[in-house]
Amino acid sequence: MDGMEVLERIRKNTKTKHLPVILLTAKSGELDKVTGLESGADDYIPKPFGVLELAARIKAVLRRSERPALQDEKTKEEHALLKKGKLTINKVTREIMIEGQFIDFALKEFELLYHLVKNQGIVYSREQLLEKVWGYDYYGETRTVDVHIRNIRKKLEEKGMDPECIKTVRGVGYKYQAEE
């Protein structure tokens, strides 16, 4: 049984599916890394690696996986609803509505919009958004944020919202400003 099979079993088991998983492997190809991460691994470390790097990555994965103490379901759902103007975001069900109409968002689009709305008025650079939404180990282009913002604006506009509720702050980044 290889690491991918172990990972699959961990993710399928309801008792273990939320455990953080780091794959330590001899496979170092880009496709192997992408496959491992997309299959549910929280991190992927090809051999050889340093002990200090391993320790730092374990600490980072544990930090990200910490969950607040369980609350009753009603309290969770109340805190999960975020309402700004016409926009309602439910963090628990991962649903976004504009005046009662559901909008379908990709996972990162949802997380990006949620982060901006939750922190309304605060300007975030592309790098900060990559760190907050994609995680510390994102190695892609910072322009990824621009593409996602463009997609979010388009979807908001299609449902009658002003796409410029996500403001571009030239030379800095983006912020959310609710419609009046």
Question: PLM ranges: what are they?
Answer:
Residues 12, 118-121, 136:
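Short helix-capping/hinge SLiMs at alpha-helix to coil transitions
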Residues 149, 153-180:
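DNA-binding patch around the recognition helix
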